[in-house]
Design a protein with these regions (language model features):
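Flexible "cap/lid" subdomain of the alpha/beta-hydrolase fold that forms the substrate-access gate
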Residues: 1-123, 127, 142, 148
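Catalytic histidine-centered segment of alpha/beta-hydrolase-like enzymes
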Residues: 131-144
Length: 153
């Protein structure tokens, strides 16, 4: 799937075979270390990432039963990916104004996924920022300005 990194490999394995073994392999995504990594990977200056986001995520991830809910969501994300062709058909047919702001160093959603919007909506505006998955953590003002500018047109 275009735009999805190899980081999805264990999740895709679970989609293909929702066994307890594959489900257990996804628990690595729910550790405090992985949550911190998701917030900081690809960020040139990790001191710009407030601990609020990953600390709050970790607080909620450690609540009883939350791990099972998250694992169910990983499994269900397959239904979202299955709808990608429908989203793309909508974009090709209706050509809505489209702004995609992307962390160019996102370890899960790669730049080709954002660039694909331009294939379906030739006027799509795609911006890449020097950051990771949680682009708002480090580029909130820049993203807000891009959205305001986009909506003003």
């Amino acid at each position: 799937m275009e735009g999805l990194s190899n980081g999805w490999k264990p999740i895709r394995a679970y989609w293909q075979d929702p066994s307890e073994t594959n489900r257990a392999a996804l628990r690595a995504f729910l550790t405090p270390e992985t949550t911190y990594w998701q917030y900081t990977h690809g960020v040139p200056d990790t001191s710009a990432v407030s601990p609020d986001g990953y600390s709050l995520d970790n607080f909620y991830l450690t609540r009883p039963g939350t791990d099972e809910v998250q694992l169910d969501l990983f499994g269900d994300y397959k239904s979202n990916v299955a709808l990608y062709p429908d989203f793309q058909a909508y974009f090709r047919t209706h050509k809505p104004p489209l702004l995609a702001v992307w962390g160019k160093n996102d370890p899960f959603f790669l730049p080709p996924g954002a660039d694909a919007f331009k294939r379906d909506v030739p006027g799509a505006e795609v911006r890449f920022l020097d950051t990771g998955h949680f682009a708002l953590e480090t580029h909130c003002n820049e993203i807000a300005a891009a959205i305001r500018d986009f909506l003003a047109r």
